[in-house]
Each structure stands twice: as structure tokens, then as C-alpha cells.
Amino acid sequence: NLFKNSKDYSNQRTGKTESRLPEIVKNIALIYVQKGENDNAIAAIKEARAVNPDDVNLILSEADLYIKIGDKNKFKELMQQAVEKDPTNAILYYNLGVINGEQGEFKIAKEFYLKALELDSSYSATYLNLVGLILEGEGPIVEKMNKLVTSRKASDMKKYDELEKDRVNLYQECLPYLEKLIEIDPTNIEALKTAKNIYYTIDDIDNFKLMNIKLQELEN
């Protein structure tokens, strides 16, 4: 599950004892979901929210419920409500990045991931997802290149070279995030392999060798 659950949400207010109501209601709703009684689960959350409409934890409990029953549009709507009430919580922006990315809204997803990093630059999953999002653009470029690779027409060769530049630019865009991810999580094999392949493609042999060494050390 790529989403961060509401239990990971931390309310930054101090000097107040947090109500246990959101967690209790969430557990009741979960029991209903496990029994296949989704309508009762939704009703339980909505009843609690009617009493405390501004409680961010209740909003997140409702969002968790909708992701469990597969309603991603409602999840996104609730996460946006949560962001409006707590605009400095990085996890909320991260979740919005995930859901928008899954729905093909890559530009919007990227904006949410960047906002999440602005608020919390230490969360490795945000970097990983952002790199993956940027590299989504590689597929269409490679597909076009493959159609031109055997052509000897000057115009096609020129198009191929332009596409190759676009591909390199894509790699250059994601490298800072990938390098930061490796700095935060140096044992992330997926990140190391991706960096290794990118360095090889852009002819950065020194860093290619460095990634190779790191991978060999981890695999041994």
C-alpha cells in the first residue's frame, strides 16, 4: 500500500489531549468493512464527523475507509479537505501525489510530491515516487525512438537525436531526487539500480561504477 495511513498523521498542536474518538470510530468502521457492511461503515464515520466536522483525524479515518473499499475519488476529495485544514502536513500532500499519479494526473501529482518534499525532505518514499513519476515519461520517448532506429532518412535521424536529448533531459531531471533518495536510504536496491542505468545511459561512467560497487556490496 503506497498510501500513508491516518495513524501516521501527527497533529502538531500541543497542550491538548487528543480525543480517542477518531481511532474508535475508525476501528468500528473497519469491523463493518471486514463484515462486508460498507454502508454501516460509512454511516459510522459520517455520524462522528457530524459531531466534529473539523477534526482532521476523523477526515483521515474516513479517507482510509474509502481507500479500503476502493473509492479513490472520494479518498482524493477527503485528502484535499484534510490539506485545507492542515496545510503543513507533508503526508497529506504525499497521499495526494499517490492518488493523482494513479489516476494519470502526473503534472498535479508532481506538484503534490514537490510540496511534500518542501515540508519534509527526509521521507524517502516521496523521492522514490517522484522519480518513478518523472520516468513515466520515458516510455513514450523510447517507443518513438524504436520506430525510427532503423531509418536512414535524414529527417528521421534528426528526430531520433532530438528524442535522445529529451530522454537525457528526463534523466537529468530525476537524478537530483534519485541521488537524495540514495543519500537518505543507501541500501535501496531499486534506487541504486535505477541510478546505475541512468548513469550508464548518460555516459557518467564514474558514477555508474560507484553504483555498481554499492550494489555488489549489498548483494554480497
What are the language-model segments listed below?
Residues 2-22, 136-177:
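Short coil/linker segments at helix-helix boundaries
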